[in-house]
Amino acid sequence: AFSNVDLVYLACPPSPRKAYALLASAQGKAVFLEKPLGVDVAESRILVRELTAAGVPSAVNFTQAAGRALTNVSEKSKVGALGDLIGVDIIVTYPHWPRAWQQTADWLRFRDEGGMTREVISHFLFLSERILGPLELVWAEPEYPAQGDLCETHVAARLVNGAGLPVMIMGSVGGAQPDRQEVTIKGSKTSRRISEFVIDTMSSGGQFEPSSSDPTDTRATGLQAQLDDLVLLMNGKPNRLATIQEALRVQILIEGILSGQRAN
């Protein structure tokens, strides 16, 4: 069945992902995994080690990785266009979870594998690490429903990078409101806000206004950029996709948040 396959895309729930990925890599196939990398950190460490040893192309689908917004913000921050970096704010709110278009993916409502923290906030922690470098969790406060097998309804957390710059997270579910998904990269001169994954705006102290990034950068354009970089990965060329090592770091942070971990 694998004879004419070059790459296996794994969009299944997290738990079986490791077994499928290793089955594919054992036959020399490249693997493109959905996030999160997994829910068991020990198992994911094994997955990363064995995929690395197999030597097959591998990456994780954090959808902003190759998009114009993250690329532009990263470039601007490196050349000082934002001034001194101050930190990152992540805000995620929903009227219901799972969202209406996810209702058939029933596992997303359960604590074992689902929830907005793994499904959405993980994207923004990946973005934050691309800009600020590796993060450490300082404290986290998740809140779960009385029915203990259901996923979190609220979450707050603080993380810091090596220089002590903070990443603050606030997530909640409930109430009459539209979906809200935004990450704000704060600078002393200019701040950038990415909303709904692709809407890139900027502020120098006033209202956030459209940035100089291409206003036609829709989510479809961002996904096409992912596929373009996937071709680069398959051809052994430099690319912007999330590595399995980056995804493991994000998973460790996410699982720490969901367990209410605090720094010693």
What label would you give each PLM region?
Residues 1-50:
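Beta-loop-alpha module in the N-terminal Rossmann-like domain of NAD(P)-dependent dehydrogenases
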Residues 176, 214-228, 242:
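Active-site loop of classical SDR/Rossmann-like NAD(P)-dependent oxidoreductases
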Residues 33, 58-60, 169, 194:
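Hydrophobic residues in well-ordered beta-strands that form the structural core
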Residues 46-64, 84-88:
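Rossmann-fold dehydrogenase core element
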Residues 27-29, 54-56, 165:
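A short helix->loop->beta-strand "cap" motif at the edges of active sites that frequently abuts
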Residues 7-10, 162, 229-264:
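C-terminal helix-rich "cap/oligomerization" subdomain common to oxidoreductases
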Residues 64-141, 145-148, 264:
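Predominantly a Rossmann-like dinucleotide-binding segment in NAD(P)-dependent oxidoreductases
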Residues 119, 125-198, 227-237, 256:
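Contiguous beta-strand/loop segments that form the cofactor/metal-binding neighborhood of enzyme cores
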